Amino acid sequence: MIYFLSDAHLGSLAIERGWAHQKKLIDMLEMMSEDAVSIYMLGDMFDFWMEYFVHDKAKRQYSPFFKELRKLHKKGIHVHYLTGNHDLWTFGGLEQIAKVEVQYEPCTIVRYGKTLFLAHGDGLLPENWEELYPPKVRSKIRSFMRLRKIFRNPFLQFLYRCLPPEVGNKFGYNWAKKSRLKEIENPCPYKGEDKEELVLYAKEQEKLHNHRDYYIFGHRHIDLDLQIKKDSRMVILGDCFQQWTYAKLDKHGNLTVHTFEGGEEKEADHAQ
């Protein structure tokens, strides 16, 4: 079995009872380890992750999570970590601490006879997005893409890594908290098949003959399972702090979406 999950946002100042949140995530991974061959984490497992040039004591809060990931590694379960927009600032530390394989870009894999496109989902837009959206939405997208470019700038990353961890973390965690509270106060539900950026992106890829059987994304914090073509489906994974949704691919190439409820799973109810 191959499992897919995303968006735990560990360490978030907007999530109450952080230790209970981390414990439930560990329970979820333990459940997966019973039959997992590999596990794909599609980004934003941390609300803020930065690897500084000096030791960062704040990362001790994630010790139980790291311990569980090392246990998975010892069992021979491969854990692949695709970075998102909250945790892209890893420079070898996660591989060393947690024994995961980090990937910084979307990837296409073939498993059990099926081709899968995996990505966190931030920054993926159809080519003609400027024609599709009204000015207010276009402006919002441009602002996000500018911010994304800043976050990925190697020189600016270097400067931030030079900060004392207590300074960098104070800013980073509070910025992430502000983002999370804004999302809670003004949630952005499923926009519909003709407006949801990731749906349009996946459909465009199919039109360009870049066929995949499954597209799997995180980022949007909505649970979506959509048939975009007769032989192609896309899934947005939801999250691992409120919805607790994940997907799994069995040895026959069947992809299903489930909800974790503290030791057991059930079929997820999807956005329409």
Where are these regions (language model features)?
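A structural signal for the main folded, soluble domain(s) of proteins
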Residues: 1, 9-12, 31, 261-266, ...
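Core catalytic region of metal-dependent phosphoesterases/phosphodiesterases
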Residues: 5, 10-111
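Active-site-proximal loop/helix segment associated with metal-binding centers of metalloenzymes
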Residues: 121-200
